[in-house]
Amino acid sequence: MIELRNVTKTYSAKQGGVLALSDINLRVSAGEMFGVIGKSGAGKSTLIRCVNLLERPDKGSVIVDGQVLTTLSSKVLRQARHRMGMVFQHFNLLSARTAYQNIAFPLQLLGKNPTEIRKVVLPLLELTDLTAKINAYPSQLSGGQKQRVAIARALVTNPTVLLCDEMTSALDPETTHSILQLLKNINRELNLSILLITHEMEVIKTVADRVAVLDQGRIVEENDVVSLFKRPKTEIAKKFTHSSIKVKLPEILRNRLQKTTLDEGYALLRIDFTEHTAETPIIDEFIRKFDLQVNILQARLEFLRDDSIGMMLVALRNVKDTLPQGIAYLNEKGLQVEVLGYVSADDWRYR
């Protein structure tokens, strides 16, 4: 279990203090995979480094497995850190040591004998699918294999908590997918509490149970992953979820959008589907009820856990008088609708 209570962190700078984290409250339950997402500079790395006190908060408490780390002496804190594994974006492997030796290194520092070390390292090589690479040096490993070594090394002290700091950012999409599947397997087999930070919503969507959205050092939204996708409340959460579903207005139309309604032209809408609304013919009913001309620009349906979510971009022609009633109808049916803007008939004709 991980808990942050009222954690604040400020860095000193020539022009005054820089607030990295402000009054952070966060709880990761035992066995849970919890994601923190935010843009670059949001404070993600500072947050995760506060968990094991690589960065010490200016105020607030950090609690891991019921132990208040912020009150511990240096000696006791070092012992407590053995229960916390950490994986970074960069692998930080020792180039002159094999995969086995890199994984074993923390145990050697703890004074374990070779027999004890072997009993721990061999199962981890198997768990991370590295048995065939036991004697390989980092220069002989792919990026994904290096990250697997780093993960095994983080697990070698039998931690209850695993901290992952942008661990897939340096990997290609296929390798990222395999590493995330490994992380899910580790969570299932070892029942670890996993806290991961990322700027990629695809990572959150793939592995996290719950997610917090971090913006300018503050948690602005927190929810289970499915609920966040269904009903994002903040603008930054909406941007993350919309970018993940990969439905985007063509640039030629974005450049021609106007904010005011037009007598002759098109209204461009983004319509979000969730739950049963993704599986019922609501748009067909909408077209018939209001006798509309509808152009579907883009549409996508995805399945997340046991739910379906989707998004559609549509252009409605000459709807100045009926648009408010149409949006109210769609909202009543459980759809979320956002008016992106308006395009004149001439601009539409020459798109």
Curated annotation (Swiss-Prot):
It is a peripheral membrane protein. One of its GO terms (molecular function) is ATP hydrolysis activity. It is an enzyme of class 7 (translocase). PROSITE patterns: ABC_TRANSPORTER_1, ABC_TRANSPORTER_2, METN. SMART domains: AAA, NIL. Pfam families: ABC_tran, NIL. The keyword Transferase does not apply. It is found in: Cell inner membrane. The keyword Membrane applies. GO terms for cellular component: plasma membrane. Transmembrane segments: none annotated. ATP binds at residues 38-45. This is Methionine import ATP-binding protein MetN. It comes from Coxiella burnetii (strain RSA 493 / Nine Mile phase I). The gene is metN.
